[in-house]
A protein has these predicted regions:
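Active-site mouth loops of central-metabolism enzymes
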Residues: 9-24, 78-85, 158-168, 277-283
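N-terminal beta1-alpha1-beta2 module of alpha/beta enzyme domains
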Residues: 1-68, 344-348
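An alpha-helical appendage that flanks or caps ligand/catalytic pockets
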Residues: 125-153, 194-301, 332-349
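Conserved, mostly hydrophobic/aromatic
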Residues: 5, 33, 37, 45, ...
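Flexible, glycine-rich active-site loops centered on histidine and acidic residues
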Residues: 2-4, 8-19, 81-144, 184
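Acidic (Asp/Glu)-rich catalytic clusters
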Residues: 34, 61-69, 96-103, 178-179, ...
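Hydrophobic faces of well-ordered beta-strands that scaffold small-molecule active sites
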Residues: 5-9, 41-43, 73-75, 103-107, ...
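A conserved active-site cap/scaffold subdomain adjacent to cofactor or substrate pockets
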Residues: 174, 178-193, 199, 203
Length: 349
């Protein structure tokens, strides 16, 4: 099975820069990935986060679509408790009208922010998480053919069949994705604890649908591929600082890399950062290739790896995504070679 490669962007602000620069960087990265033939480029949704510019996800997706040619662009994801499904369908149906066969709709059941901000987003609606399965079904209806519609229709979404993806960081979403026969995307970049169990549940309980005949798993992982392991670890110190700033409640911009990470962080924070790296793809091309193979042995095969990186140096970030493509292509070539060899052995024993 060939692995596809894609990317997620939270549109972070780098230290010393502003929101406009972060959005420009988002577009520049999208154009780079478009040229590299990445499968898809997703943009997250976060609110009341001073270091991220991903609060108006649909607008950023449209802006990215306007500045790219081929790559699929979507949400990673739209946090459905924050939005009326009708509005989501209208927005994504409009984008699918403007950019046919290029729009994805990844859906999450968490608010993507703190509870006070979530309350401000949905005002008197406090049960959005529990309505998630019902609202996913409603979106499927809105994007479906005319004969499936009710009185309220999400024009121009009708008949657009925008692909839906169920996002998750726990086993709850795995059950829903399996039951509905939809692709499943696990947030291994920030909540890997239940990843193995969730993927197993999804694959075991999967029910074929009009969308998929068999399970389709995407895992999102922190990914930094550099010329050598030491350089990759150095670049990854920015990621560690981002993660620690979240736990401290400070939400700092992306910091420059440092060789003094152990001195900047507390022993507990440093241990946490090193533990997180165990489930990250950080290293040279050879190292990352081996890490992906180890990942498959532990978690089972996945269809697609969605890379996310907090690399301060923009050129190094672009280079990392180029190297990541090389890694996936090398793995796919080896897989194809092995398949051909097995076929040859069976035909000519």
């Amino acid at each position: 099975m060939a692995i596809k490669y894609s990317a997620l962007n939270l549109v972070p602000i780098r230290e010393g820069e502003d929101e406009q620069t972060a959005i420009n960087d988002m577009v520049n990265l999208a154009q780079h990935l478009d040229e590299l033939s990445y499968e898809r480029y997703w943009i997250a949704e976060h609110h009341n986060a001073p270091n991220l510019v991903s609060s108006a996800t649909a607008l950023l997706i449209q802006h990215t679509l306007e500045h790219t040619k081929h790559i699929r662009v979507g949400s990673g994801g739209i946090m459905l408790p924050n939005h009326a499904p009708l509005i989501v369908a209208e927005q994504f149906g409009t984008m699918a009208t403007l950019f046919p066969n290029r729009v994805d709709l990844g859906l999450g059941r968490a608010p993507g922010t703190d509870m006070m901000t979530a309350s401000a987003l949905r005002r008197d609606q406090h049960d959005g998480v529990y309505k998630f399965p019902e609202e996913v079904s409603l979106l499927q209806q809105y994007f479906g053919p005319a004969h499936q519609q009710a009185y309220v229709r999400a024009y121009p979404a009708v008949g657009k069949n925008v692909p839906l993806y169920i996002l998750g960081s726990s086993t709850d979403s795995a059950h829903l994705a399996a039951r509905k026969g939809l692709p499943y995307v696990f947030a291994g970049h920030f909540a890997p604890q239940q990843m193995k169990e969730a993927i197993e549940i999804y694959k075991t309980l999967f029910e074929p649908s009009d969308v998929l005949d068999e399970p389709y798993v995407i895992v999102c992982l922190n990914t930094i591929v550099a010329e050598n392991d030491d350089e990759a670890q150095y670049l990854a110190s920015s990621t560690a600082q981002v993660m620690v700033s979240i736990t401290r409640g400070r939400m700092q911009p992306v910091q420059p890399p440092t060789h003094e990470l152990q001195n900047i962080l507390t022993p507990r924070e440093y241990a946490m950062a090193m533990e997180r790296q165990k489930i990250s793809l950080i290293g040279s091309e050879n190292t990352v290739q081996q890490k992906i193979q180890d990942f498959m042995e532990t978690y089972g095969e996945v269809n697609e790896i969605m890379a996310i990186s907090y690399i301060y140096d923009k050129d190094m970030q672009l280079d990392s995504y180029r190297r990541f493509k090389n890694v996936i292509n090398q793995i796919n070539e080896k897989t194809l070679y092995n398949v051909i060899n097995k076929l040859s052995e069976s035909m000519y024993p």
